[in-house]
Amino acid sequence: MYSFFGAVILAASSSSSQYTPTFPGGILIAWLICNGAKRNPIGGWLLFFYWQLYSGLLITLALFVTNIQSYIPENFDSREKYLLFLLSTVPTLMFFLIQLAVGTILLSVRTWDLLKLLRWVIIAEIAAAIVSTAIDAAYFPDNVGLNFLTIVPESLWLAYLLRSVRVKHVFQTHDWEIAVNSIYPAKPKIAT
């Protein structure tokens, strides 16, 4: 649900007097690993997509566990407000889990049809986050900002999955091993 970048932004913007150790080099390490694997079929930005997908699972689990009391009906003024809260959170969580499942299967199956399904799941997740934003704006204004941690990154990943040359070669034409040489020419080795 929440992307890796979104969690970093959220962590950076939180104002707490408590000392919280951070690891600012995490994004640099992710970039180094993903860039270093750019000649692999699942490398470069595509590997970074999976990096944020699985780190998003860890962050979502951590946020869910630390805020589990938010899902208890007794913490709300009325039953209607509790149902609105569930309507604003559960669909986005469910679409994220579906995206995680489809993305994981896509790693081994690598078919164009499954990629199209992944795109539709991301579209549904964005739509759910937009509906969640509308509900939150009316009933839970403190939660509105969190929805943009889903809408913005997922929109960017959707654009990537729609336009990427790598994605087309890996999932549609299945010729990445040939295409990689024109996209990322091998560096000539210096004889010693």
Feature map (PLM): residue ranges:
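Topology signature of small-to-medium multi-pass alpha-helical membrane proteins
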Residues: 5-192
